[in-house]
Regions:
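Active-site-proximal substrate-binding groove within the catalytic cores of carbohydrate-active enzymes
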Residues: 31-36, 53, 470-675, 689-699
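Active-site-adjacent "subsite" loops/lids of carbohydrate-active enzymes
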Residues: 307, 323, 363-368, 376-435, ...
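Glycine-rich, aromatic-flanked loop segments that form ligand/cofactor-binding clefts
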Residues: 95-117, 121, 125, 285-298, ...
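Aromatic- and glycine-enriched glycan-recognition loops and surfaces
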Residues: 317-398, 417-424, 464-473
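Polysaccharide-binding surfaces and accessory modules of carbohydrate-active proteins
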Residues: 3-33, 38, 50-257, 263-267, ...
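Short Pro-Gly-centered flexible turn/kink motifs
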Residues: 269-287, 692-702
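Active-site groove signature of glycoside hydrolases
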Residues: 340-347, 423-456
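Conserved, mostly hydrophobic/aromatic
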Residues: 37, 174, 274, 334, ...
Length: 703
């Protein structure tokens, strides 16, 4: 807990001065990767293997045994990439054992290595945004391997590590180059395998029942399933048992202590002569705590480092338009209130799949008008959960029928003729109209396809991989062309900007009173691993799916108190909601309320976009609240506090200021009142007393 910690030497509060470096050991036998927060050591002869993986913050050693660097199946045969043999005791490694280990002739052998400065994975133009972003810095090391087997004569494998500055993070991926004159088939490719120290022991227990190693968090850019959470969307992390670890406590050798990373359904991808196959990219983040908030802060720090585009957070309206005049009116309203962007929502009259000259010209003109007012403009398109045709939809491998096993009931195949044309049409529409934002509903959800006639994939065995690559290629293109992407699935590491915070859609048909509390619960629950800018919420200005007048805000001027509070809840959390309807205001008094709220948000934007500390979840019985913290800003913290009760309340709470970076005294003010001085106790807390009117809220600034 923070009680024993000193926030002045905590890398999450004060950045470390050490930079990523790669160096050889004195005896030239080892290559060491280190950045002050983690250290990873490789023995490079007689073959290459990782012998040491250590968290420098708490001294934890993660490895109990050595394993090959990677595994690859080529033309049906499996090969190890690197690897040494001879370890008998697999519960720990003694450094002197490593000198006696031997290589196997049939493995890919280590040839050479290169070290470079880290280059960004996607070349997005940063710093067009009010919040400071930067491309990641660090070192990139490539270990090159080849095989002595005649059949693999011209096949080269490279294992890549990217070590980041200032965060205990290493990214690992593998590339395969086919320098031969014939096609090869790449089957299962395991890009990472680690014999990890077990998290716990049990004499009897299954891998499912036993905890997995907590000192490492893994995230790979191959995730989908509509959960709005990475851990449930993950498709590549496999916690396996290790039968050669004979000294483990578990009687049946069932301890989950062998980690392998690979996409399960990718078993046969053709690699043409001269081409390079690149594996998934696995982010390995070392954890020094069980504390949920701290673990979440580390993950949020990772997104800011590796996917800085997730920090962009334009203030947008979700317009449901029937004609061009409504678009022009909405652009004018955005401009008048300080909004920054307009998205033509689902159900509006913008069809991004209509590539006719007439449609392009119409939207180009509207985009030009938006840009003349300083407003970004975007459109909506649905990929999955729609039916196109028997020829173009995903074919179920079991029944051979279209759509029979689609995740959303129906789905086109991204590799079908229609799917390939869909991608080209979207790019052309965005390029020709000058649209700035793309809202992609139903992004590719992982459906396999058994068709052998689709031009974009060969058969079932490469269908998921090829569709994934096509979906990612669209997001890479958007990212590198500065197009902002909202997509409700986990494609952040491949260039998307925002995902749904995690809500039940029909709740927006409930009375506004329920929506207020449920929205605060969604914010609290949705921001453990995500930063505020990575999520969108929802505010139905007009009827959405169901509900009567008690559920909607129109006429806006008659519901100003609720409209303002719903805005303050989201903007106060740093979360952009989809304000869905035909207009942002109906009267001058409504316009003033919207403008004042946006002006407040822009004034405190830096702290409101900072990570949140969870204070108390909304339960409708007592106060609830969250607090943003930013140790690097002038404003160190900002609290949003709510009273859902029908009477005024006064409460005294302990405010945890550890992650604000404050050490001695905090200056705290309610809204724009005079600040009072508070001395922090040994646990970096202050006692704060506040009063909130019935069914209302307040906010405090900490400096």
């Amino acid at each position: 807990s923070s009680n024993e910690k000193n926030n002045e030497i905590d890398w999450l509060v004060n950045p470390v001065s050490e930079k990523a470096m790669v160096y050889k050991s004195a005896d030239n036998n080892d290559i060491i990767l280190s950045n002050g927060l983690l250290k990873r050591t490789f023995r490079i002869q007689p073959n290459l293997v990782c012998t040491d993986f250590k968290n420098m913050s708490n001294g934890q050693q993660l490895l109990r045994a050595i394993k090959p660097e990677a595994e690859i199946t080529i033309d049906g045969n499996s090969y190890n990439i690197g690897g040494l043999y001879g370890q008998i005791e697999n519960g720990y490694i003694r450094p002197e054992w490593v000198n006696k280990f031997v290589a196997h002739d049939s493995d890919f052998h280590f040839l050479s290595y290169e070290v470079n400065d880290l280059k960004p994975f996607l070349d997005r133009k940063l710093n067009i945004w009010p919040m400071k972003q930067q491309h990641p810095t660090g070192k990139d090391i490539a270990f090159n391997f080849s095989s002595s087997l005649a059949t693999l004569d011209s096949i080269f494998v490279t294992v890549h590590y990217e070590l980041h500055d200032g965060i205990p993070l290493i990214v690992k991926w593998v590339s395969v180059k086919n320098n031969s004159t014939h096609v090869i088939t790449v089957g299962k490719l395991v890009n990472e395998q680690l014999a990890l120290v077990e998290e716990e022991s049990a004499v009897v227990g299954t891998p499912e029942q036993m905890k997995k190693q907590h000192g490492i968090y893994l995230e790979t850019n191959y995730a989908f399933n509509n959960a709005m959470r990475y851990d449930i969307s993950d498709q590549t992390t496999h916690w396996l048992t290790d039968s050669v670890y004979t000294s483990q406590v578990n009687y049946n050798y069932q301890t989950p202590c062998l980690l392998k990373v690979y996409p399960e359904k990718v078993t046969g991808v053709e690699l043409q002569p001269g081409d390079i196959f690149k594996s998934v990219r696995t982010h390995e983040l070392l954890m020094d705590s069980y504390d949920r908030e701290r673990r979440g802060l580390v993950i949020r720090k990772m997104y800011r480092a590796v996917a800085p585009w997730t920090m962009e957070n334009p203030i947008f309206m979700h317009l449901v338009s029937r004609n061009d005049d409504e678009v022009i009116n909405a652009i004018n309203q955005c401009s008048a209130t300080g909004y920054e962007a307009l998205i033509l929502s689902f159900g509006s009259h913008c069809n991004m799949e209509d590539s006719s000259a007439e449609n392009i010209a119409k939207w180009r003109k509207l985009a030009d008008y938006a840009h003349s007012k300083g407003i970004l403009i975007g459109g909506y398109s649905l990929f999955s959960s729609r039916r196109i045709s028997d020829e173009d939809d995903v074919i179920d491998p079991i029944t051979g029928k279209p759509d029979a096993a689609a995740f959303f009931g129906n789905a086109p195949c991204m590799g079908s003729k229609w799917g390939l044309a869909y991608l080209a049409t979207l790019k052309a529409f965005i390029s020709k109209t000058g649209f700035d934002i793309f809202e992609n509903d139903g992004p590719y959800p992982g459906d396999v396809c058994a068709s052998t006639k689709h031009p974009g994939h060969k058969d079932l065995y490469d269908s998921q991989w090829k569709q994934m690559e096509l979906q990612k290629s669209l997001y890479h293109w958007c990212n590198e062309h500065g197009v902002y992407v909202n997509a409700p699935d986990w494609y952040f590491l491949d260039g998307t900007n925002k995902i749904a915070i995690g809500y039940r859609e029909v709740n927006f048909s409930l009375p506004r009173e329920n929506q207020k509390i449920l929205n605060r619960q969604n914010i609290y629950d949705g921001l453990w691993e995500k930063t505020p800018s990575m999520s969108w919420g929802f505010v139905p200005l007009t009827r959405y799916q169901g509900g009567g007048p008690e559920a909607v805000l129109e006429p806006l001027s008659e519901h100003l108190k609720d409209y303002k509070q719903l805005m303050m809840q989201y903007y106060g959390a740093g979360v952009q909601a989809c304000y869905r309807g035909p207009r942002l205001y109906d009267t001058d008094s409504t316009r003033k309320v919207v403008s004042e709220t946006i002006a407040w948000y822009k004034k405190y934007r830096e702290i409101l976009n900072a990570d949140i500390i969870h204070l108390r979840r909304a339960d409708g019985r007592d106060w609830d609240g969250i607090m943003h913290v930013n140790p690097h800003g002038k404003t160190k913290a900002l609290l949003m506090l709510y009273n859902p009760l029908k009477e005024k309340i006064t409460r005294t709470i302990k405010l945890p200021l550890y992650y604000s970076g404050i050490t001695g005294t905090a200056l705290i003010r309610e809204q724009e009142a005079a600040a009072k001085s508070y001395k922090l106790n040994r646990g970096y807390e202050v006692e704060l007393t506040f009063t909130i009117a019935a069914e209302s809220y307040t906010w405090f600034v900490v400096e």
